[in-house]
Regions:
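Glycine/serine-rich phosphate-binding loop and adjoining beta1-alpha1 elements at the start
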Residues: 2-66, 76, 107-242
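N-terminal cofactor/phosphate-binding cores enriched in small/glycine residues
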Residues: 33, 51-54, 82-86, 90-91, ...
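Extended, highly charged clamp/arch subdomains and adjacent linkers
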Residues: 67-70, 97, 101-104, 152
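Conserved beta-strand elements of the Class I
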Residues: 80-82, 245
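Active-site cofactor/substrate anionic-group-binding motifs, chiefly glycine-
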Residues: 82, 95-114
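Gly/Ser/Thr-rich loops at beta-strand to alpha-helix junctions
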Residues: 83-91, 111-115, 161-163, 250-252
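Glycine-rich phosphate/diphosphate-binding loop of Rossmann-like nucleotide-binding domains
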Residues: 88-103, 218-258
Length: 258
């Protein structure tokens, strides 16, 4: 692997910039982060037994290895999945599971403030292409997003809808290679349903947010707990004796109230 040649796109002078795998290399500091990230991922794996069972089956069967849905997929890479998700230890477990099935994964961060640099470094060492670092600006965000699209994905995985929107607005030549996508958030689903209503959505997108396992568990318990955790981290207040007002009664609101 060699260093990036074009400093205007992604200068390695950025102390926490890294990217993988083809044509790039980790800086020494970020290589040191990889070990820490690996431990985080292993911790998450120990608490995600269902996904680990799926990974074991994927590892045996390799369902994506020789999957060529379009004649244009002739590079032997198998199914190519482009992801714009939160780059966290939990997402890392998903990415490694898809890779175990024979897919080529390219990942960028859906939120500059949620990216865990050590986890991203560990994924690069696992052979997954990562275009993300914590705190990137708007220009770099879209640079990273377009690097994922440059891999010509067959499936998109979105958290907020930016991949699908970019494809339909500026990268329409990629649509012929795509068989479908997924969207995790209510925000993204609303965007895509509006596109479908207007007749401009060019490939099917699965609304992950509508799955029972999403709203009954993740929205209710996950968002409920993480919201309280965020309040505590931001304010350091004692909850005892406080009055809470929850505006809204969807599954997230119910979880917070619980």
């Amino acid at each position: 692997m060699s260093k990036i040649k074009n400093p205007k796109l992604a200068p390695l002078a950025r102390p926490n910039f890294y990217i993988g795998v083809k044509g790039f290399e980790l800086t020494k500091r970020l290589k040191n982060l990889g070990g820490q990230g690996k431990l985080k991922i292993e911790w998450a794996e120990s608490h995600m037994p269902v996904l680990m069972q799926i990974r074991a089956r994927f590892f045996r069967e390799k369902p994506f290895k020789n999957f060529t849905p379009h004649q244009s997929c002739l590079d032997g890479a198998g199914l190519k999945i482009g992801c714009c998700l939160h780059v966290t230890k939990e997402t890392a477990v998903l990415a490694k599971t898809l890779k175990a099935g024979g897919a080529r994964i390219a990942l960028c961060g859906s939120n500059p403030l949620s990216t865990q640099d050590d986890v991203a470094a560990a994924l690069v060492e696992e052979g997954i292409e990562v275009f993300a670092w914590r705190g990137l600006n708007s220009k770099d965000y879209y640079w990273c997003l377009n690097k994922v699209l440059d891999t010509k994905p067959n499936i998109t995985m979105d958290d907020g809808g930016d991949l699908v929107s970019a494809i339909h607005l500026k990268r329409k030549e990629l649509i012929k290679n795509i068989i479908g996508g997924t969207e995790e958030t209510t925000t993204g689903v609303i965007r895509f349903r509006a596109m479908e209503k207007d007749g401009v959505l060019k490939y099917p997108v699965v609304a992950v947010n509508d799955a029972r396992t999403k709203y009954l568990f993740d929205n209710r318990y996950g968002t409920g707990q993480s919201t309280i955790d965020g309040i505590l981290r931001a304010t350091s207040v004692l909850l005892a004796g406080k009055n809470f007002v929850v505006s809204g009664f969807g599954w997230c609101g119910r979880g917070i109230a619980m």
